[in-house]
Amino acid sequence: MKINVLKRTKGLLKVEIEGEGHTFGNLMQETLLEDKTVDWAGYDQPHPLFRQSIITIRVKGEAQPEKALERASKKIRADTEEFVEKFSSAIKNEN
């Protein structure tokens, strides 16, 4: 995974994520939209043959889009860890 900042202005951040496609882009978009400071979030995969997502975030007021992206990343990580724990528990309880 490689991240390139394409555009950064007050209240707006656009980043390119090389090596990630729709799965990651959609997950990040959905998680960003749960953040109350985010006004708009979207992703684009410019070409179907290349694993590359472009994520755009626009925030409300004085919020920082970089912080919103950081919070979304941490939430995805926490949700994934919770899933692993619950899945492991479910497998153990099945036996």
Regions found by a protein language model. Name each.
Residues 1-95:
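Protein-protein interaction/assembly regions in multi-subunit complexes
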